[in-house]
Structure formats: structure tokens, C-alpha cells
Amino acid sequence: MNVYRTHLCNELREEHIDQTVTLSGWVYRKRDHGKIIFVDLRDHYGITQLVFNDSDTTIFQLITTLRLESVITIKGIVKARDSSTINETLDTGSIEVIVSSINIETASDILPINIASMQDYSEDIRLTYRFLDLRRDKVKNNIILRSKVITEIRKSMENMGFIEIQTPILTSSSPEGARDYLVPSRIHHGKFYALPQAPQLFKQLLMVSGFDKYFQIAPCFRDEDARADRSPGEFYQLDIEMSFVTQEDIFNIIEPLMINIFSKFSSKTINKEFPKISYHDAMLYYGSDKPDLRNPLVIQDVTEIFRDSEFKIFNSNIKQGMVVRAIPAPNTAHNPRSFFDSKIEFAKTLGAQGLGYITFIDDSLAKGPIAKFLDKDRLDNIKLICNIKAGDSVFFVSEIADKAALFAGEVRTLLGKELNLIEENTFKFCWVIDFPYFKYDHKEKSINFFHNPFSMPQGGLEALENQDPLNILAYQYDIVCNGIEISSGAIRNHKLNIMYKAFSIAGYTKEMVDEKFKALTRAFKFGAPPHGGIAPGIDRIVMLLADVPNIREVICFPLNQSGEDLLMGSPSEIDNDHLKLLSLNIIKKT
């Protein structure tokens, strides 16, 4: 191959025995047996066992003192291993290389991370020495998986007739809802670029430009706090937009793409049919707009059962406009009191006043703090609606609808985990559809967009003119897998009169819309096709495929939870000359 290697460290087999070879790589492990030292030499592709003996004292002394993770180039002769030492777990496990010469390319310092160890290290250590962390198989394999997934996505998109187009990184502030990263302009005094939260406007403009099917693996930047499924700062998405499409057309593109990717890169099962769940039903039955369908528990509304009942607390709540939601807990009726108390305390940590519960000991006996206030008909209705059998329990939460959904959803998730109800080794996809178009901001006492302001309202202009805004639905959709939102998307509003009307309900004048989104409104005056799109998150897809709990495990050089790059030392201060050049002044926080 070249002066550094004739073979890779995963290549040598019995057919290479007695050949002279050159290998290069990192000293992965050393085993000192007195007059013989065994070294596992590692490169990107695999491991080869090297043998150093004391017949050459110079070489032997070098390898004796050399630290792990030093980089070496060796020459040697391939030999068969003794049958008792064959390592079936290695591709090269039937051979070893007797070293005749060695060149130390670079010697390693004392390691802050043991590459060969399964030891857990703090995230700060791992990210500060990320170049070492990436040498570990598990982390490296996540990054390789990411590369393969992106390659497969590109092939699939091209096969479906999509064109890959790169959109600008330096742009103007966007309406996605998160905070922008701003870049001051040196030339245009007092003005700023923004890093794109998403290529939203550009991809819509591409449709107006006449492109039919667009995609890109798009970098996006949002000044958000970190979560397990969200990396602060930068993330990547498969950005897609199509002209002359309906919502179903988008689904018909994404579903086979997801099935292909998840089937190709995981041995887990995947549902071939993606159920469609309205936002209303998702919040009612699962307590989340990101329902985890691996959890079989289904929340039920039992408000009418408690209306005018003897249980005064719930009855009073109902008269004040609150609801009652029931969360089944199978096979828990005989659990100790501590089981039920722990769920009550959990609900309180969420902000709920508590939880009620009933245990159905057998077909005729119900116990618990609430049971004595309900007659047989009401108890039977609870059993029927919640699909309860003897030996099951039911928890109840009573709150205003939004809070009841939140609390019930969290309790459902907790019960699913504690009772080992979550179906393992499977991917459960679903679509969440029919999102509200508007929402009421209680703090600002105003109506605002629920999600994407550029989506088409269901019912069009007529709905905007004649319906209660809070009852209007949008052509918006999310694709969810195992409780994680993979992507949001929408059929876009391509008609200016509908756009102006929608924004006016949210408090924007026509002039404000034209000023804020002038490129889009100008373009829509010259023939805009119906269009829609979606943008599955690359990081989240790979996180699910790699089966890791944290999205930073599948990003090569991630920021930490505080939004810091510990490896490169950013964000960092800049000198006064640079500040002056950009006409900036740092105001100290008080």
C-alpha cells in the first residue's frame, strides 16, 4: 500500500503466514510475559496481535517503555498462533506478527482516558479529550453508523428524484421560535446575520423557483438548552420540500424511507403501518404529543363518571371546568401502600395536587380512597372504559385539561417503566396530525401561532374568517418513534391572502409581514405552487438506531449541556481590536 502499511489491522489471515508485512497503528494493549511482550496493534479497521521477544534488546526495550496509544509502524513476519491461543473474537485471531523492526511515529503522554477500558468517565473529561473518546469502539461505531445512515439517506432521496441543494448559512433572523445565533457584520455597521434555525424560507423559495423535489442534510443552529434528545447549538436534519403535494404525499415519501433506514441499520422490529393520531387524541389517550406506542397503557377521560358523584373533590373540580383522567395500572391491586404513595408523591413533584386511585381486588370488591364514594354503576363504567380486570388498579388526576394531560402522561410513562410494560427491541412509529393552528397566550393575553406560522390552515380563508381561531386546525404533522419526535412538517400556506389573514389574527399587520418575510411575500406574488415538507432529525434517527440515551453520543464533537465546547474552548472572549472592528461593546451583567 505505502511505506506505512502493506495491510490493515483487520486483514491478515492464515493465507498470509510467512509473509513479511508492514503495519501501522496505535498500541492498544500490552501483555508482558517476561521474555515476550504481546501488543494489540489497532487501526481504524481492526486489531492485530504483535509479538516482541528479547532476542533484539533494542526493540524489546522500546516496546517495554512505550505507553499505550503511542503510534508505531512495524515490520514483521506473519505466523500462525498456537491452537490454544486462537482468538475467535478477532478477524485476525488465528495469526500473529513476529516484529523485526519498529518505528515510533509519536509517543503518547499519560492517558486521561483508558481506551481499552469499559470504564465510564465524566462527560467533561470525555468532551475535553474527545479525540481520545472517539478511539473507543462504542463511540467510534456511533459515528460510523451516522455516516452510513446519511449515505443511505442520500441514495434513497436521489432514487426518489430529489435534488440536493445547499442553502445559505449566513441569513436573517427566522421565525422558528427559538433564539438565533447572531453574527455581527463588519461591513454593515450595526447589522447582524443569523445562523439558520432551519432552511424554512429558502426551501419554500426553491419551490417558487420551480424546483419540484429538494433535499439537503442541513445544519441548523438554535440557541436552546440541552436535553437528552436535543443538542444545544448545532444539529442536522434531512430537510425536504416538494411541490404540488398533499399531506399524504409527504407521508408516502417518509414512511418507506424510515422503514428502509431502521430496517437496514437495526435488528429491532419496526411497524410497517404508521398509525395517524390527532393531536387531540394524542394528548387525551397518551398525555403527550410524542406518544410512545411501546407502552400499552391508554389514558381515558372519566369526567362524566365523576360528575354529580359523591366524591366532592372531583365533582367540585368538574363544576369549575376541570376534567378527570384515568390511568390504568394492571396487576397492581395487591401492591403495598408504598407503591401508591410513591405515585402520589411523583405527581406532586410535577405540580399536581395529588392522585386518586382505586384497586379492583376482584370482580366484586373495589378499594382505595375513592372507591367508597362511587356506586356500583360508576365503578363498573370505570372498569369498562379503562379495560380493567380483577387485580388491576386505576389512578386518577383532576385538573384543567392541559395540565391533566401532562400529569396523566407522565404517570403513564412512569407506570410503563416500573411495571415493565414497555415493549423492547422494537420501533413504534406514528404520525401526530391535526395540530391546532393557533393557541392562546395567557401571559400576553393574545392569540399566537401554535407551531409553524407558514402552514396552511384546514378550511383555508373561510375558516380564518368564520371560525373561532382556537378551533382551527393546521395541515401540520409530526412523525414520532418510541416517544421521540423525529420531525415536524407541514403543508405550506402558498396564498398571500390567507397568509395575511392568519398573521392578522396573531397580531401582525400586512406591513409587518411584508417587512419581516419580504422575500417570501415578494416571491408569492409571482406564482407559488402548493408545496409542503418535513425535516427528520439526523441526530435523533442515529440516536435511536445506536440505542443510546443521549444525543451527544452520536455527534462527533458536541457541546456539553451548558453549550460549551470543552475541546476547543468555545465560546471564548475576543480581543478589543476585534470588538472595535465589529463596532461591538461588551456590557457586563450586573
From Swiss-Prot:
Residues covered by region (Aspartate): 200-203
Pfam families registered for this protein in UniProt: GAD (PF02938), tRNA-synt_2 (PF00152), tRNA_anti-codon (PF01336)
EC number(s) given by UniProt: 6.1.1.23
Keyword Aminoacyl-tRNA synthetase carried by entry: yes
GO MF: aspartate-tRNA ligase activity; aspartate-tRNA(Asn) ligase activity; ATP binding; nucleic acid binding
Gene Ontology CC annotation, any one: cytoplasm
Binding annotation for L-aspartate: E176, R222, H451, R492
PANTHER family: ASPARTATE--TRNA LIGASE, MITOCHONDRIAL, ASPARTYL/LYSYL-TRNA SYNTHETASE
Recorded family membership: Belongs to the class-II aminoacyl-tRNA synthetase family. Type 1 subfamily.
Name of the protein in its database record: Aspartate--tRNA(Asp/Asn) ligase
Gene that encodes it: aspS
